[in-house]
Regions:
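Active-site histidine-anchored catalytic micro-motif
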Residues: 155
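Short, high-confidence coil segments that cap the C-terminus of an alpha-helix
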Residues: 167-171
């Protein structure tokens, strides 16, 4: 990636830095494309353990971004948890790594009993909005929009509409996605990219 906060991203953009590097996991699984914008971040250092139990990596990244946004905006707890404060945030899909784990549990035990309740919020298509709204006690509108690679942009546009229509005063908007080989195999299994800094056209 090109940074884990606004300052790091800003500096990387000024320097023309590329965040695309070789991904060893993708190489070990035999992907023809073995490059990615890997995120160098230990989410457990930024999200409480109790909260993290319900999240896949994508939701955790969104949680960290929302925390940073709140601090940047100087919002109070009363302003965040208010009926005039809402949230529209999504992802292209659920946590595919969590879905694979659940599948492996069923295959191993020939039963879904050991999957556990924490898999539910990880595997919902609304995992981002559900996790963020719960963690930050959002009382206004709260839902996800899923539209593949345009998800975050559509969420932000929809959030602006809520303010323009005078339905909300403050909106949290955007999205989050996990970077895992289980997600990559759905669309990168046949694409070949070998040069990290050279985009596919």
């Amino acid at each position: 990636s090109i940074g884990n906060n606004t300052n790091e991203v800003y500096e990387s953009l000024l320097q023309g830095k590329s965040g695309i590097t070789k991904n060893e996991d993708m190489a070990s699984y035999g992907f023809r494309s073995q490059v990615a914008g890997s995120i160098k971040l230990d989410v457990s250092e930024h999200v409480e353990k109790r909260t993290l139990r319900f999240m896949g990596p994508g939701a955790a990244y969104a949680h960290i971004a929302m925390d940073q946004a709140i601090k940047d905006a100087g919002l109070t707890e009363k302003e965040i948890s208010h009926t005039r404060t809402g949230l529209v945030a999504g992802s292209g899909g659920p946590s595919t790594s969590a879905m694979l784990t659940a599948h492996q549990i069923v295959l191993k035990n020939l039963s879904p009993k050991r999957i556990g309740p924490f898999a539910v919020p990880k595997c919902m298509s609304s995992t981002i909005s559900a996790n963020l709204a719960t963690a930050y006690k959002i009382k206004g509108i709260n839902y996800s929009i899923t539209s593949a690679c345009s998800t975050s942009l559509h969420c932000m546009g929809n959030a602006v509409d809520q303010i323009l229509l005078n339905k909300q005063d403050i909106m949290f908007a955007g999205g989050g996605e996990e970077l895992d080989w289980t997600l990559s195999c759905l669309f990168l299994s046949l694409i070949h990219i070998s040069e990290p800094t050279r985009p596919l056209r």
